[in-house]
Design a protein with these regions (language model features):
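Pyridoxal 5′-phosphate
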Residues: 1-424
């Protein structure tokens, strides 16, 4: 038996230690194959309860008195992420703001901590918001931004960042190096510990973006020697659209760094309302303003579920689920003109794979409108499909790929117009 046999895949679900969690998510249409948890996770039922309880049992009756226990919620919620998904000890993570804001804050703090260095390194396959922010920072501070050219969606492993890729660009002028842990398009996984060690050896700092990694693979920020990290919570974290992001600052360097936006939540004696800013000597020194409490309740309920499931089991299912996808691609989709833009080694990828096809945009729209399959499209020619380990069954993946094969083999997708939506 093999992955090509649906009964074999059903048996995988029967033996799956995470299968029980699927019933904890809202599934409006049981016939839908939702393979886009890498973009937005499903809604956990317990989140509905958590938000309702906050509105009716806290905000409603407590009013402003609630701030006595709400005020510091960004920190223990950050500790929950560290324990459940990031391999980080307490006191190093805040759940706050957006990934873009946190990225800007930590980038500027890092370059200010290396004032005699003028070079920042990233890669052209990095997520656009990170690249755009770096361009602005480089202009603002007169820095040399080096962009490693690795964005070729037709080369399967070209986007993966390794020490060998980075080495030619390193010298004693490098202040900051920043990459994705999992590349947003291809799903390629960077060498986190090795690259961090490599950059620290020349005196630079490394900022990782874990947005496409958290909740899909096992991370160990502390033992990997990571300096700085940011990420979102709404993908494999299942915390909802627009949910608060997070930032990680190693205790080693917290007192060394100063963020550019000095909000009052970072003030040492916050409620003395003093005339000058004095940074709190803890992770709170990186918090700008009030925690987003409704969003934080969503994060808490979702990451408590991840903690219950165990990130090791989650990572195993990600690896097996993407292995299933790749085998189905080899037998069903490659003969139909698809290419694979994701590393085959499970240690070199995350929870999604990228299927390249010249008609990718049209196929993606047709899958949603004709086949009840939801993946997503990324320019110029990629369809991303993912297994979200707590919410997705193996057979949902199998059925989704069977529908992709049927749609493309029949040519029916050619009758569908490409979407006019700004969102793909």
């Amino acid at each position: 038996m093999s992955y090509l046999d649906r009964n074999f895949v059903l048996d995988l679900d029967t033996k799956d230690p995470l299968a029980k969690f699927k019933s904890e998510f809202v599934v409006d249409d049981p016939q839908l194959c939702y393979l886009d948890g890498n973009s937005l996770g499903r809604l956990p039922k317990r989140t509905i309860t958590a938000v309702t309880d906050f509105l009716t049992k806290e905000w409603g009756p407590e009013l402003v008195s609630g701030w006595s226990h709400w005020v510091d919620e960004a920190q223990p919620t950050g500790d929950l992420l560290g324990k459940s998904a990031l391999g980080a000890a307490a006191g190093q993570i805040l759940v706050c703001d957006t990934t873009s804001v946190n990225f800007y804050q930590l980038c500027v703090a890092a370059i200010k901590a290396r004032p005699n260095r003028k070079t920042v390194i990233t890669d052209s396959a990095n997520f656009p918001t990170d690249r755009y922010i770096l361009e602005g920072i480089a202009r603002q501070f007169g820095l040399n931004l080096i962009m490693i050219q690795n964005e070729d969606p037709n080369v399967a492993t070209n986007e993966r960042i390794t020490t060998e890729v980075l080495a030619p660009y390193l010298n004693d002028d490098v202040a900051l190096v920043t990459f994705q842990i999992i590349q947003y398009r291809s799903g390629a996984r960077s060498e986190v510990k090795a690259i961090t060690d490599q950059v620290r050896a020349i005196g630079g700092l490394v900022l990782w973006d874990a947005s496409h990694a958290i909740g899909a693979i096992e991370l160990d920020l502390d033992n990997s020697g990571v300096d700085l990290c940011v990420g979102c919570t709404y993908k494999y974290g299942n915390s909802g659209p627009g949910s608060p992001a997070w930032l990680y600052v190693s205790k080693r360097i917290q007192n060394e760094l100063q963020v550019p936006i000095q909000g009052w939540f970072a003030q040492e004696a916050q409620f003395e309302m003093g005339p000058k800013f004095e940074k709190a000597q803890s992770i709170r020194g990186f918090q700008i303003a009030s925690p987003s409490l409704i969003g934080i309740r969503c994060v808490q309920s979702a990451f408590n579920m991840i903690n219950e499931a165990g990130i090791t089991q989650i990572a195993k299912k990600s690896a097996q689920g993407t292995e299933l996808m790749i085998e189905l691609y080899d037998h069903w989709l490659k003969p139909l003109g698809f290419d694979l833009n994701t590393p085959r080694n499970s240690d070199h990828r995350g929870g999604h794979i990228s299927l390249v096809h010249p008609d990718a945009a049209q196929i993606c729209v047709a899958l949603r409108t004709l086949s009840k399959v939801i993946p997503d499209y990324r320019t110029p020619n990629s369809i991303r499909v993912a297994i979200s380990p707590l919410a997705t069954s193996y057979v949902e993946v199998w059925d989704g790929f069977a529908r992709i094969r049927e749609l493309v083999a029949s040519g029916e997708y050619k009758k569908v117009k490409e979407s006019g939506s700004r969102v793909t």
